[in-house]
Amino acid sequence: MSEQTQTCASEIQATNVAVQHPKSEKINLMNLTRQEMRELFAEMGEKPFRADQLMKWIYHFGEDNFDNMSNINKVLREKLKQIAEIKAPEVSVEQRSSDGTIKWAMQVGDQQIETVYIPEDDRATLCVSSQVGCALACKFCSTAQQGFNRNLTVSEIIGQVWRASKIIGNFGVTGVRPITNVVMMGMGEPLLNLNNVIPAMEIMLDDFAYGLSKRRVTLSTAGVVPALDIMREKIDVALAISLHAPNDELRDEIMPINKKYNIKMLMDSVHKYLEVSNANHGKVTIEYVLLDHVNDGTEHAHQLAEVLKNTPCKINLIPWNPFPEAPYGKSSNSRVDRFQKTLMEYGFTVIVRKTRGDDIDAACGQLAGDVIDRTKRTMEKRKFGKGIAVQNH
């Protein structure tokens, strides 16, 4: 094992503080991939195809009551009720933006995470969290200011998709656009929770569950290089890189992880990923949040073009979304336009991401949730006070 991989393993272990459950507790079937569920049924002396049936009930029909699973015999249903449960995070608060975006505070133990549904004309994207809080301390991100609490379990990750699907109507004809895309861009750094994120994404891709195509599941990372190297051997999904700076000096300042894995190391790892991935037509999405007079100058655009000159990519420019006590300002439209045009002159595809849900703090970089605040800041500044408590579906 390489020194970098060993370092990554220790980092993942350091953040692996998910809630420990007593052995006597029931098995949450949402923690299992289909293969793991088939193994469970084999241990029970049942045919493995029962796992396929159960997966369909849970994820195709949104069913969490064994009694309603009509093609599973009563004896097996009773056996399942004794040892297993189907349990997703519940919604404690819901907020709806004027642009159709919905943000949910979902309860995970005694804490909350945030999940965002973003409908568009041709798709509907669900932004999913992977951790309670975040350990990476990026200076422009609200989540990072709260510190890190713990990793989410598989059921807490895939359960966000399940719960959102129940609410917006994936399991029935409601006139609301169903979820077509899932992005691991919510709270947390997904590559520091690989042991739970990869199985959750496997369920998203599984035809017996959500059956999403590889290009419709996107993992976004700030650049935990050894973990990205591990992931490329495990699963193929679309990749997005939170770059946000065109040189190491600036990236060190705004994204401390760069001091450990610099831009060259990160881009080398990205190229290796693209060599084996066909999830997004051999391209990576580069995310770049624009901070006024920090990283949005013409010289920064030229530097970014140099960094990306040999990388098949699409560039998403993200207008920065303010949060309390943040040390930055939002770039003017003229600076955004100039930055975009400079990159386009090099031949890059450059999109300025439309800000969605900023009136409910659901926009990029604004998610914080009700976590145990390691920085001792109160969460009363959040806008969830304007939300409504909801009955769980």
UniProtKB/Swiss-Prot annotation:
**GO biological processes:** rRNA base methylation; tRNA methylation
Active-site annotation: E114 (proton acceptor), C364 (s-methylcysteine intermediate)
Free-text comment on the cofactor: Binds 1 [4Fe-4S] cluster. The cluster is coordinated with 3 cysteines and an exchangeable S-adenosyl-L-methionine.
From which domain of life does this come? Bacteria
Q: Where in the cell is it found?
A: Cytoplasm
The record's section on Gene3D superfamilies has: 1.10.150.530, Aldolase class I
**NCBIfam families recorded for this chain?**
PRK11194.1, rRNA_mod_RlmN
Q: What is this protein called?
A: Dual-specificity RNA methyltransferase RlmN
What broad taxonomic lineage does this protein's source fall under? Answer: Bacteria, Pseudomonadati, Pseudomonadota, Gammaproteobacteria, Pasteurellales
